[in-house]
């Protein structure tokens, strides 16, 4: 049986570093909620069986009317960490008929620059891979190590083999669920899905990502994201 495709959008974070009064995924950029751009990109990929958005149980900011016309489901099963939210979302996908051998693409709600083309490139590259992988970019900047709490450079780190992880991250549902559960049992709270897969002894692949697919994190990121999204809208 051909594996199906599912998308999972963990959307339970508060965005504390963004300096916003509301969670950043609901901030308006170029006339739309930031989350809208992620949902629209996956909605444009009709090959996906379902896109599941994981909200915090007490989220009072989500308004489905802002995303009218887009195909997705919502479950209020977010946990205390990204890892917990993703695990709860993976378990929730069973409600939509997802099987262990099916693929899931986990994507940050705060990466509005994702495009259907990048999603399809990732899927086409990894659909026959035994493990899966992520979109990522080779590190371009020189990296300096600074001790925690300090402001003095300890050393310069070689960047030759370093890549900056992005999302989506694409893995088999069963493999990813088992990897996260193992990490939790062993007391590890990992910051992305590939880390859990690596922790289980597997080797994910990297697929070239895009600079426009950056994560909106700090206050100054909103203006850059808005400029990119507005330009894309004007070009279409």
From Swiss-Prot:
> Which reaction does this chain catalyze?
2-C-methyl-D-erythritol 4-phosphate + CTP + H(+) = 4-CDP-2-C-methyl-D-erythritol + diphosphate
- Pfam families linked: IspD (PF01128)
Q: In this UniProt entry, which cysteines form S-S bonds?
A: none
Q: What is its EC number?
A: 2.7.7.60
Which HAMAP family does its entry note? IspD (MF_00108)
For this protein, the record's NCBIfam families field holds: ispD
Function according to Swiss-Prot or TrEMBL:
Catalyzes the formation of 4-diphosphocytidyl-2-C-methyl-D-erythritol from CTP and 2-C-methyl-D-erythritol 4-phosphate (MEP).
Family assignment from sequence similarity: Belongs to the IspD/TarI cytidylyltransferase family. IspD subfamily.
Q: What is this protein called?
A: 2-C-methyl-D-erythritol 4-phosphate cytidylyltransferase
Q: Which organism is it from?
A: Burkholderia multivorans (strain ATCC 17616 / 249)
């Amino acid at each position: 049986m051909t594996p199906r495709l599912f998308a999972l959008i963990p959307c339970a974070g508060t965005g504390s570093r963004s300096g916003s009064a509301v969670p950043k995924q609901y901030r308006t950029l170029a006339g739309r909620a930031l989350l809208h751009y992620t949902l629209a990109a996956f909605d444009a990929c009709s090959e996906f069986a379902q896109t599941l958005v994981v909200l915090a149980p007490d989220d009072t900011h989500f308004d489905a009317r802002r995303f009218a016309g887009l195909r997705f489901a919502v479950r209020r099963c977010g946990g205390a960490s990204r890892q917990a939210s993703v695990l709860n979302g993976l378990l929730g996908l069973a409600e939509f008929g997802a099987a262990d051998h099916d693929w899931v693409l986990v994507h940050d709600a705060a990466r509005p620059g994702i495009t259907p083309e990048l999603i399809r490139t990732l899927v086409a590259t990894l659909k026959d891979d035994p493990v899966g992988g992520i979109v990522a970019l080779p590190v371009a900047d020189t990296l300096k190590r600074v001790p925690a709490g300090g402001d003095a450079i300890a050393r310069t780190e070689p960047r030759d083999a370093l890549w900056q992880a992005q999302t989506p991250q694409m893995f088999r549902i069963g493999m990813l669920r088992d990897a996260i559960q193992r990490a939790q049992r062993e007391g590890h709270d990992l910051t992305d899905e590939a880390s859990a897969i690596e922790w289980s002894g597997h080797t994910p692949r990297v697929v070239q990502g895009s600079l426009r697919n950056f994560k909106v994190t700090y206050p100054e990121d909103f203006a850059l994201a808005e400029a990119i999204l507005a330009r894309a809208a004007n070009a279409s």
